Amino acid sequence: VILKTTASEYWSYVKAGAEAYSKDNPDVKVEVKGATSETAYDEQQNMIETDLNSGAYDAFVIAPLQADLVKTLIAGQTAPIVAVDTNIDAPEVLSFVGTGNEDAAAEGGKAAVEAAKAAGWDKVQAIAISGVQGDGTATARLTGYEKGVTEAGGEFLKDEIQYADAVADKAATSMEAIMQNHPDGVAIIVCNNDDMAMAAARAAKGNAAYAKTIFVGFCKGC
């Protein structure tokens, strides 16, 4: 099992689940690993290449940081492969396990607009603090947020997307930049995951212009 990273709470849960399966099924040996961050592309690539060529494994579960690259790496593989979190568009992949990111984000965007209106915002604008730029999961969530916000009558500021590599600390820095650029406040901040949303909200705490801002997360650190 090769995850995007093992350095976040969300992925630690995934790791624990895989290891629990191995414990409950002693005839199946599961090895779980992951990159040190969601931008450690070369590190994950080396893991995948090494394990595919080792001959030591009968099946693979991969959460790709770069799905197009992994598609090339697994070409011609006959061992079963399952994609997790971000799909890999390749015939070698038997199944995909993950969230309907675009649809779920769209629902979140719609709910955020309604909450912003209820909070008293006349100008309902949304800015996104996203994950890793170019990542399929992050892109799907952005697309969904934009769709949901727009359909509910809000304005999604697409040109002001902040990319924070799915990391809470960077999300806080992005929020500082947003507050500097929008001193009068922004109605909605949509984030790639819950950890980022909480970090952004903490960064805005004490700023009266953001007292009624709606912060939207997605999932715990994913």
Spans of features found by a protein language model:
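A residue-level marker of the well-folded mature domains of exported/periplasmic proteins
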Residues: 1-222
